[in-house]
C-alpha cells in the first residue's frame, strides 16, 4: 500500500516514463533529426589540450591499440562489445598522434555515415556527451589534412549532437549525466564562435547545479565520494579548457573546484583510494594527483568531517567514520545503509573496511552492497537500517532510492594529545525495535591503537532482539579466533599481526565478500553477536599491534 509520499513519487515516475517513451519515438523521426541541423561553423577558434581527456577517460596505456584493429570493421555490430565503450571515444587519449591520424579520420568518417541520426544507445546522454568532449579535445588531429567535405560533415555532427543535448538538458534528472552534458555544451561554445550561446547556457546551468547540489564544504548532497570525484574531474576539464581558450573562468567554478579538491584531499586514504561509504568503490585518483599536490590546505580549510565522514589521523593510524544521516530521496540512488560504520588504516595498510559499492560487478552485487550487513557496523534482527524502494517504475526513474530515513544526533568530538575521535547516536532502529545505537571510536595516540565503545539502548517492551556487530577485514587479511574466545589474531603479513579484543563477549570469525572492485572477492569478518531483552548494553573493544 502506497503512502502519500510514495504515491507522489510513483505518479511522477509514471509521468517521466511516459514522456521518455514518446520522446524516444519522436527522436527517431526524420522531422526531429532535421530539426537538429543548424549553421555549420567555419572554423575552430582555439586548439584545446588533448591530454585533458586523461582526467575523465577510464582507459589506461596500452589497453586499446588502434593499429591492431581492422578499421573497416570497427563499427560492425558485435554483441560482445560495450556500446558505451566504443561510441564514447574516450579511448582517443590512447592514440599515437603521429601514427594513428589516418585511422582515426576513417573511424569517424564511418561513424558519421552510420550514426549521424539519433540511434538508441549510441545517442544515450552520457555516451553522447563523452563523445563530444573526446572529439573536441582531439579536434586538431581529427581534421588535420582532412577534406573540406569531411571537416564540414564533422562540424555538422558536433552541432547536431549539441542541439540534441540543448533540447533535452532541462529534462535530464540524472545529475552525473547533467554535468557531462553541461561540460560538453560549454566546450562546444568555446570551440565555435557561431555557438557561443552554448557556453553561456552551459555556465548558467552549471551555476544552478552547483548551488543546488553541493554543501557549504563542496561535498555532494548525495554523500557519495565517487560523485565528488566524478564532478571534480569534469569541472577541472572545463576550467582548464576555458583558460586555454583565454576566456574568463567564472569565480563560482574556481571556488567549487577548490572546495572539491580540499574534500578529496581530506578523504583520500593511505592507499590512494576513497573510503567506501555511500556509493564508494575502488577509483584511481592518479589523474588528480598533480592538482592535489599543488593544493595548499590552509588551517581554516582543515576540517574534522566532510560529507558526513569524520576524519582522524595520527602518525601511523587513519580513521574514517560515517556520522551522517541519509541523503534526501532524490539523491539517494547509490546510498549504502551503513550509519556509524568505519574504516581503519594502520601503517598505510587498510585493516577494517566496508564491503564497497558493487556497481561495477552486477545489479545483485550492488543491491547486496547497500545492506547494513555489508558495512562495519551494527545490525539488529538481520535488517538494514534504511529500507530501499522496490517499486520498479520509481527505480527506473529515480534509481534504487531509499524509502525510509533516520537521524544522527549527539555528536561529540574529542581531539587532544591522548585521543582523537568522536561519539554519535543514530535512531534508525527506534521505530521497529525500540532501540537507539551509539558508537564511540578513538585513535589512541599514546598506545597507538584503536578504541571503540558501542551502546545499544533498549526500551523495556519485552520484545527480544538479535544484535550483530560486524568488522569486515580488508581482502587479503586473515583472522584466527584465540583460545580465550574474546579476541582474534589478524594476520597482516608474515611478521606483522594485530589483535582484536572485546571485553566479556565472545567473537566469531565468518566469511564475507568484498564488492568494491570489478569482481567479487572473499574476505574475513569478525562478529560480536547475542540477544537482548529489556535492558541496555555496552561493548568495549580495541585493535592494537601484537607485541
Where are these regions (language model features)?
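Carbohydrate-active enzyme catalytic cores, enriched for enzymes
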Residues: 215, 219-353, 357
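CBM-like, beta-strand-rich accessory domains located in the C-terminal region of large
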Residues: 2, 7-10, 129, 360-547
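Extreme N-terminal leader/anchor segments
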Residues: 1-72
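Short alpha-helix boundary/capping segments
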Residues: 123, 128, 332, 336, ...
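Residues that flank catalytic or metal-binding motifs in active/ligand-binding sites
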Residues: 87, 181, 308, 340, ...
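Short polybasic amphipathic segments
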Residues: 56-64, 310, 342-344, 454, ...
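Aromatic-lined, polymer-binding surfaces characteristic
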Residues: 79-257
